[in-house]
Swiss-Prot record:
Subunit structure: The APC/C complex is probably composed of at least 12 subunits: apc-2, apc-10, apc-11, cdc-26, emb-1, emb-27, emb-30, mat-1, mat-2, mat-3, such-1 and gfi-3. Interacts with ubc-2.
Taxonomic source organism: Caenorhabditis elegans
Gene: apc-11
Keyword terms of this UniProt record: Cell cycle, Cell division, Developmental protein, Meiosis, Metal-binding, Mitosis, Nucleus, Ubl conjugation pathway, Zinc, Zinc-finger
Pathway in which the depicted protein is active: Protein modification; protein ubiquitination
Compositional bias segments (type: Polar residues): 18-32
GO molecular function: cullin family protein binding; ubiquitin protein ligase activity; ubiquitin-protein transferase activity; zinc ion binding
Protein name, entry field: Anaphase-promoting complex subunit 11
Length: 135
């Protein structure tokens, strides 16, 4: 037995300039076929539906605006201190900023990009955008 769904449809006859309102009765299979054929159509019904979300996948995005974090995204050492490859902080361990606005120690990002992997590593390790240093 197919469930009958009442639907109000308002037709706009532009040649006559008046609105006619009529009731249509459609079976649920006809309704689904119509919605499949015309996915942009929203039909008003009095049917309420209850759903349960069993799984939810969430994705977030963030970026440093001015290299504003205090630590390197690779070695997690403070920018004020030296990276793992340097003995002393300063000009020998410069901070570099990518076009994605993520900041790293120069030695850390150079080592990251040069590391052998199956995939190209000329990408920011935090956001995977192509890595280019802001000059």
């Amino acid at each position: 037995m197919e469930q009958q769904i009442q639907m109000d449809e308002q037709e706009n006859d532009e040649s006559q300039g008046n609105d006619d309102q009529q009731n249509m009765s459609m079976s649920s299979s006809e309704l689904h076929t119509m919605q499949d054929d015309h996915p942009g159509i929203l039909l008003k019904t009095n049917t309420r539906m209850s759903i349960t979300v069993k799984k939810l996948h969430v994705c977030g995005e963030w970026k440093w605006l001015q290299g504003g974090e205090d630590t390197c995204g690779i070695c997690r050492m403070e920018f004020e201190s030296a990276c793992n490859m340097c003995k002393f902080p300063g000009d020998d361990c410069p901070l570099v900023l990518g076009i994605c606005r993520h900041a790293f120690h120069r030695h850390c990002i150079d080592k990251w990009i040069a590391a052998p992997t199956n995939q190209p590593r000329a990408q920011c390790p935090l956001c995977r955008q192509d890595w280019t240093i802001v000059e």
